[in-house]
Amino acid sequence: EAVDKAAERVATKLTGSDRVRAAIGGVENEGRHVRFANMPELRRFDELRQELTLSSLAAPETQTFQMMLQLALARHGKLLDATLDLGRFQSDAARDIARLGLANYFAGAAVMPYSQFLQAAHDTRHDLELIARRFGASIEQVAHRLSTLQRPGAKGIPFFFVRVDQAGTITKRHSATRLQFA
């Protein structure tokens, strides 16, 4: 819940119609430079130059999410690490993967703050497109966030997110509750 609360504080600065510009301001306030380039990968961070490069080909909601991911790693690294200290990881690699996952969670929570998002889900009867427009997020980001709404006393409905490719292969799945996959 501490990660959610920290992300909600960041979310208060992501207001207005130009969320990308607001996100750039948040990252640059941390002493990092943001630039856009025509490149296939979504993001690249140059540690030496403290420069975040984002794909100019990515949708604005993806660019905003990637900047919030970088902000999580830069400004809230100690919080992420303290949260991860509660886990028992078998290797440093496993912890690194979990840290990136937690930073991604932070990014989603910054773009779609818990209480506001839960209320919007109820108000729209979980209409993914309406929620996506309201928060400037993609359908996939909204579906993923819906699957994480498990705060005690303010839980969302059990929501299962599954992404499937054209061949029917599951390429991503997420749920905070149990769902058995064959």
Protein language model features and the residues they cover:
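Short juxta-domain linker segments that transition from a proline/glycine-rich
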Residues: 1-182
